[in-house]
Amino acid sequence: MPESNAHIRNFSIIAHIDHGKSTLADRLLEHTGTVSERHAQAQFLDNMELERERGITIKAQTVRMRYRARDGVDYELNLIDTPGHVDFAYEVSRSLAACEGAILVVDATQGVEAQTLANVYQALDHDLEIIPVINKVDLPSADVPGVRAEIEEVIGLDASEAVPASAKEGIGIGDILEQIVRKVPPPKGDPEAPLKAIIFDSWYDSYRGVVMLVRVFEGTLAPKQKIQLVSNRKKFEVQELGIFAPFAKPVQRLTAGEVGIVVANVKEVQDAKVGDTVTEADRPTEDPFPGFKVVKPMVFSGVFPIEAKDYEQLRDALEKLRLNDSAFTFEPETSTALGFGFRCGYLGLLHMEIVQERLEREYNLSLITTAPSVVYRVTDTQGEVVEIDNPAKLPPVQRIAKLEEPHLTCHIHARTDDVGAILQLCQDRRGVQRDLKYLGTKRVQITYDIPLAEVVFDFFDKLKSVSRGYASLDYELKGYEEADLVKLDILINGEPVDALSVIVHRERAYHRGRELCQKLREVIPKQMYEVAIQAAIGAKIIARETVKAFRKDVIAKCYGGDISRKRKLLERQKEGKKRMKQVGSVEIPQEAFLAVLKVEE
């Protein structure tokens, strides 16, 4: 183990999705001999099956590598893997805070994309040394000089020394390691000072409680030491320390500059929040890390078990997921249409998909999920402000003074050919254009303010389809703005179905209501009586569709004879249908709730 910090290098890899970040990490591990051939597997650091399958990194991981440089000196390299997706932007910023350098991976066939830029700016905010790497040079469509020029033009980094590499073929890996050793500064920090460490990830281990991934900046961590978390003042005793190389192995101490895991009998992941500062209980540090914030969910949806008996199992599954994911929230809710379930909060759409997929895959649950909604701010006539994440909880129109909805600032990177289609899409989503600048001859950066409610629905999919997959999106929350919003209720035979109600912009309400009714007419099965499907704003019905009734041919047995005989039978049938309608209730199939999600814009 290096005696001084001079031989330690802490770095992370930043890249847009699919630019080859996890593959590069695999090659670095193999090149330094950290992972033996026996354990090697693709995307080594992505532990979750889902991460491998979707090719995305969800949780941060770290690994320590020993590397003998070309000058014969042994170095200790700590790779801190960061999630690349915009939903996890805060986790990325905390992971970057734990490093001194970053490898910027750019795909030689794609060039610079939106999330690459977003992460680079964060890295520059943390004063990291950035090493550009142009990946996938083995592909026939690779354009290395073009990408080099783009890195200089768009990001403003000197790309003359950018390493051309192919993580897949293992080209250029040695050069990357040399650049890390040469360019990334060693960590500063005094091992004797009061302890100061940042938590950049934490997860739950069923045997040891919460495991915290920390980077020590000042002081030393040792077993039996009393530590304190700055944000909530809770105190714990360190039980064990370890490092990943790449499998966890225990160490006796972690000193300034090092990265490792701490187990300290913490029972809840909520206590060890990402971005919090760890310090000594007896002599706390004077300056904890700035920028700590509690991550708030932005998107909500109801999750209900299809079988009522799975309710407890769903609760257990959600509890377990929450142990590992402090940003995920849930609370019980009841719906007259769907029974008992939970209202869950997520960071964004990808986060929502991942949680739902994990519930279905890891816990074998079959679920109904309602349309995603966002948090609205309602000021009532008394002047009170309430936040509402469920359309069903919206107060009656008469009591609302104003309604505000969250807005995002979206940065879209695209090819110049697709600008028209993208501007049209943003316009349709009630977007306001803020900026449009050309980056070279082929790429363009478009900045729009768009309401979050318009983005959560299917904006990302639409963006990909109008740009043939080339556009990339990055967004941050801008704040709340007042809007003319109404609650659209769906009534079936005059009864409102709470799980189908949505909050929409008044201009869109008629259009949306009509489409919903048409969609529901297709999925609600015929009954023995007529079923009326109506869309309403308050007491005003704005659209209606009817599902026709089944009819038995009651006059089949009459041959000839008087018309009054037939009329009597038909009248009797009508009476019966009327009575049925009064007592009958319509069973709404699962497809109906999904239909709400799939209404084409």
Curated annotation (Swiss-Prot):
User: Is the Mitochondrion keyword given for this protein?
Assistant: no
GO terms for MF = GTP binding; GTPase activity; ribosome binding; translation elongation factor activity
Q: Mind listing the GO biological process terms from this record? A: positive regulation of translation
First-level EC class? hydrolase
Chain residues that bind GTP: 18-23, 135-138
Q: Where in the cell is it found?
A: Cell inner membrane
Which HAMAP family would you find in this protein's record?
A: LepA (MF_00071)
Name of the molecule in the record: Elongation factor 4
- What is the organism field in this record? Anaeromyxobacter sp. (strain Fw109-5)
Query: Taxonomy-wise, where does this protein's organism fall, top ranks first?
Result: Bacteria, Pseudomonadati, Myxococcota, Myxococcia, Myxococcales
